A protein has these predicted regions:
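Secondary-structure transition/turn motif
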Residues: 26-34, 101, 111, 298-300, ...
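N-terminal beta-propeller domains
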Residues: 47-76, 107-109, 127-211, 296-312
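A short beta-strand motif characteristic of beta-propeller blades
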Residues: 72-75, 117-122, 178-184, 222-227
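Beta-sheet-dominated scaffold domains
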Residues: 187-364
Length: 364
């Protein structure tokens, strides 16, 4: 109901938490009266939190020895990193599937129009996963690093993954009459990333590479290990180009063309000697097909956000580096120019050549 010109059927920002059961919002205009109460009951729907902007060490109590350094000083020996918010995005037909790192999975239905918001997949889908990927050939949705009990986030297993029934976003319980199922990878401590490749899905842990292939009923998908000691450094640090996979590891660059190979890199020491390992999960990979180049955007050791790029020409086998902050990159497959994003919430139309051309940012 409208009370004194105030319409509560709107979107608001919470400006103050009063106590455990109440908060304050600010309306965009003044009320036309001074009614103290009324208007009936209110049902509120909340957006998810934006998550941390940067990764930080999780300095737990008891790190290092008693009396080391000064009170309140963070101890750099902590091995726990609290990752910045990352998203995985993929198409399921015309719709968008989005998963927040260690969070829920959401569907944006394009038929509802651009002003509608993405919604949760519902109560039958896992409540927490590391990331998602759609098998476009078989029309299954994969959730990696997900829950062994779909309703319990505390059962999230970083090496466990599920796939939905074919053509379904809500059927995750395996049955004799569907193709839903699950598998677990053995080598590593967590699944880091995955890309679709020719005839299979390539999945990396922090230690190894695995291939996921469709095998039909009753198992639907099977897995086999393709490489060891060749883990992925970040969720978005791998890419497939014409059936060959290229990725950035913790201390070297690799490729897979049927066999895992460590790539000779003339700038390897320059990159890894000045890399922020705290913020390594921000690393993003893209390909510029016009110039046969793969780019890895990464944060330098003194940065909290991406500020550099290392580039590999996969036809010439050459490398170079530069200073450029991009958080994602899409080559000019669909649009006239490549499209990229940067940390200040801008969408950037990149020039196809850098000579005398300035990239134009657009707010998003």
């Amino acid at each position: 109901n409208v009370v004194d010109g105030i319409e509560f059927n709107n979107e608001f920002e919470i400006t103050e938490i009063v106590d455990a059961s109440s908060y304050k919002i600010t309306y965009s205009s003044n009320a036309t009266g001074s009614t103290a109460s009324g208007g009936g009951s209110v049902t509120a729907t909340y957006q998810i939190s934006v998550g941390p902007a940067t990764s930080t060490y999780g300095y737990g109590w008891g790190v290092l020895t008693w009396g080391s350094s000064t009170w309140g000083t963070a101890r750099a020996s902590s091995s726990v990193t609290l990752d910045a918010r990352q998203w995985s995005l993929d198409n399921f037909g015309e719709d968008l599937i989005a998963t927040a790192l260690n969070g829920g999975t959401y569907q944006w239905d394009t038929s509802s129009g651009p002003t509608t918001r993405a919604v949760s997949l519902g109560a039958t889908a896992p409540v927490a996963s590391r990331f998602s990927l759609v098998s476009s050939d078989t029309r299954h949705l994969f959730l990696f690093g997900t829950c062994t009990d779909v309703t319990d986030a505390t059962t999230q297993d970083d090496l466990f993954f599920r796939f939905s029934d074919r053509e379904s976003l809500t059927q995750w319980a395996p049955k004799a009459t569907n193709e839903a199922g699950s598998l677990r990878i053995a080598d590593g401590s967590r699944i880091i990333g995955a890309v679709t490749s020719t005839g299979q899905i390539l999945v990396w842990t922090d230690q190894s590479l695995h291939g996921i292939q469709f095998v039909g009923t009753p198992y639907t998908f099977g897995q086999r290990q393709l490489g060891a000691n060749c883990g992925l450094i970040a969720q978005h640090a791998a890419i497939d180009v014409s059936g060959k996979a290229y990725w950035m590891g913790d201390d070297a660059f690799y490729m897979y063309d049927g066999v895992v190979k460590k790539m000779p890199c003339s700038v390897q020491d320059y990159v890894y000697d000045d890399l922020s390992y705290t913020n390594k999960n921000d690393i993003a990979c893209g390909v510029n097909p016009e110039f046969n180049e793969i780019m890895w955007y990464y944060p330098s050791s003194s940065a909290t956000q991406i500020d550099r790029v290392v580039v590999y020409n996969y036809l010439e086998g050459t490398w170079y580096t530069s200073t450029l902050g991009r958080t994602s990159y899409l080559g000019n497959y669909t649009f006239e120019n490549p499209i990229a994003t940067q940390y200040d919430t801008a969408l950037v139309a990149n020039a196809t050549t850098s000579t005398g051309v300035t990239n134009t940012p657009y707010g998003v």
